């Protein structure tokens, strides 16, 4: 491909982005932000959650996962209600090749497929915290069966200990998903949690861009670009969190890019976050790459029906 064709192809490329609005409490909520003394955690391990010993039982893992359909102008797919994962997304207007009958481009794929690639949000406990938080096996309920541009979807899960977790998901006319995380606390005491978001890739792709195009983990934090390789994540991952790279800052974005496609998460641009790249070995030469953000200041939700952080 000559340079002119390359530039045209790049200009025509689509971008899949997910915006996460962390720190926007509604005025009537009893939410209070405060700086906790403990350090900000990295992204939780894949398929791991908090203390779920007192949580309601999850659905039978042998049954097909319940899903919410996605149908917008430029994309279609579905959202997995087990784990609240955005893991099935196809671009309606782009094909893999120029040949007749070529399949549409798939940018997100579930964990049980050959090339898993997905986006996930959640909450992590502060040090010493014991809130039962949703994990990869939590089955959420949805208020609608289909997510469209005109119809956002809200997912809910009650942990049985007084806290109700909610995730509101909306999509625009292009490729942007707006995701709002909210906790309603009916317990008697305040709870402190770190919201997080991440792009997860469960395989090592064959890189095709050469020296002209970066492929792999990428981020911009405090207006500074960082590009890393899959190899550097595998070599640099340090137990117990298997974090290979981290940077604290304000706003920005982070994700994993291919030759033409990018999946990224975008925190609220005035929020203090820690961006991380990590690699979780899963056996043999296989593993999972995670790129994302964790809030540096925990979400503190007052008891007695206090709630936060919903979009205003």
Identify the role of each PLM range.
Residues 67, 71-312:
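Soluble non-transmembrane domains of integral membrane proteins
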Residues 42-68:
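Short, Gly/Pro- and small/polar-rich lid/capping loops
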Residues 9, 39, 51, 137-140:
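Intrinsically disordered/low-complexity terminal segments and short unstructured peptides
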Residues 1-46, 147, 159:
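Subset of Sec-pathway N-terminal targeting signals
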Residues 38, 42-46, 57-58, 117, ...:
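Generic low-complexity segments that are intrinsically disordered, proline-rich and/or Lys/Arg-biased
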